[in-house]
């Protein structure tokens, strides 16, 4: 058990209803009248929903110890996706529902972290930035540079991202997997 006064960003807790949450933001509030409390913004680990929660000062919550295993994505197999533990070489099959949030950025042979709680796979954590190849890009209109104009481009997974006008098909770019935003050209 951990006091809500000791909550930190990134900490995972288990609430009384059995749900597992990760702390995204927290704020200790001490009003002029009444008792102090902690206002938090939390992300549900199982479904990704974000919710604000308020706890009374001094309240205790159960800490959820989440195991993170380094695995390599191998290939899709029907309705499942096959991953391999990089240390033991054991293979693990995950369903589409378990990897759905990561699918737009999941590339074969990519190393990912698999989050596991009490033997239950909670989801996949991708690297923060990855290198992807643009397979199709809308043509940029010359002279249309009055502001920070972007165009649609399709990456190798079929996902569409917004890129600057100068990016063409065949180029490698870096993408932030948390937001899906273009972060720059890849110079590797």
From Swiss-Prot:
One of the record's GO molecular function terms: translation elongation factor activity
Domain of life: Bacteria
Subcellular localization, as worded in the UniProt entry: Cytoplasm
Pathway assignment: Protein biosynthesis; polypeptide chain elongation
GO cellular component: cytoplasm
Family annotation (Pfam families): EFP, EFP_N, Elong-fact-P_C
TM region positions: none
Residues in the signal sequence: none
InterPro entries: Elong-fact-P_C (IPR015365), NA-bd_OB-fold (IPR012340), Rib_uL2_dom2 (IPR014722), Transl_elong_fac_P/YeiP (IPR020599), Transl_elong_KOW-like (IPR013185), Transl_elong_P/YeiP_cen (IPR001059), Transl_elong_P/YeiP_CS (IPR013852), Transl_elongation_fac_P (IPR011768)
GO terms under biological process: peptide biosynthetic process
PANTHER family: ELONGATION FACTOR P (PTHR30053), ELONGATION FACTOR P (EF-P) FAMILY PROTEIN (PTHR30053:SF12)
Similarity annotation: Belongs to the elongation factor P family.
The name this protein goes by in its record: Elongation factor P
Gene from which this protein is expressed: efp
């Amino acid at each position: 058990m951990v006091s809500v006064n000791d909550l930190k960003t990134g900490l995972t807790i288990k609430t009384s209803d059995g749900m597992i949450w990760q702390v995204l933001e927290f704020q200790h509030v001490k009003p002029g009248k009444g008792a102090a409390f902690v206002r938090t913004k939390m992300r549900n680990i199982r479904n990704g929903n974000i919710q604000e929660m308020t706890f009374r000062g001094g309240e205790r919550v159960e800490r959820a110890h989440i195991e993170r295993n380094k695995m390599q994505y191998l290939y899709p197999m029907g309705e499942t996706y096959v991953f391999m533990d990089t240390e033991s070489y054991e293979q693990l099959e995950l369903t589409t529902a378990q990897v759905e949030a990561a699918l737009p950025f999941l590339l074969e042979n990519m190393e990912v972290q698999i989050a596991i709680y009490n033997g239950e796979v909670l989801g996949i954590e991708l690297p923060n930035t990855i290198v992807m190849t643009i397979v199709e890009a809308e043509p940029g209109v010359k002279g249309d540079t009055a502001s920070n104009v972007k165009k649609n481009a399709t990456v190798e997974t079929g996902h569409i991202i917004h890129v600057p006008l100068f990016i063409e098909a065949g180029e490698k770019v870096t993408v932030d997997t948390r937001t899906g935003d273009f972060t720059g050209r890849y110079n590797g």
